[in-house]
From Swiss-Prot:
It comes from the Bacteria. This is Cyclic pyranopterin monophosphate synthase. It comes from Staphylococcus aureus (strain MRSA252). Pathway: Cofactor biosynthesis; molybdopterin biosynthesis. HAMAP family: MoaC_B. InterPro entries: MoaC, MoaC_bact/euk, MoaC_sf, MoCo_biosynth_MoaA/MoaC, Mopterin_CF_biosynth-C_dom. GO terms for molecular function: cyclic pyranopterin monophosphate synthase activity. Its EC number is 4.6.1.17. It is an enzyme of class 4 (lyase). Pfam families: MoaC. The keyword Zinc-finger does not apply. The gene is moaC. Belongs to the MoaC family. It catalyses: (8S)-3',8-cyclo-7,8-dihydroguanosine 5'-triphosphate = cyclic pyranopterin phosphate + diphosphate.
Amino acid sequence: MTEFTHINQQGHAKMVDVSDKQITKRTAVAHSSITVNETIYKQISNNTNTKGNVLNTAQIAGIMAAKNTSTIIPMCHPLPLTGIDVHFNWDETNAPLYTLNIQTTVSTTGKTGVEMEALTAASATALTIYDMTKAVDKGMIIGETYLESKSGGKSGDFQRQLDQ
């Protein structure tokens, strides 16, 4: 059974000491999504939302979220991130509902991974889209948020299988 590394001998929270870990290149890819109605889909696609360019703003929010993960997730180490990218892809197969898939990729060269940074970026991106379009419809659905893959580090690589 795997031990919880964020709990000390007294059962209290602690930040894991990574001093003795090797510096390696680490990358994580996360996914989230938001399902919107046709009006919001058209506003985003045509860049006609009254609050501005929704995707550009959400992309910046995702980047900022990755950079600030250690300030909102208590046991995350502050990391010198070397790359952050946010991609969007529309799924139009269930019209009149449209799902915007969000993929975030975060990289570093360091002693601990960037999974939480990628997940935080994906979440903040979806939340920003909700915030910027909620005046049109509050019934949007933020979908599953999960780690797609990670590479580097002691625990090795991870690739989510389609049936997970």
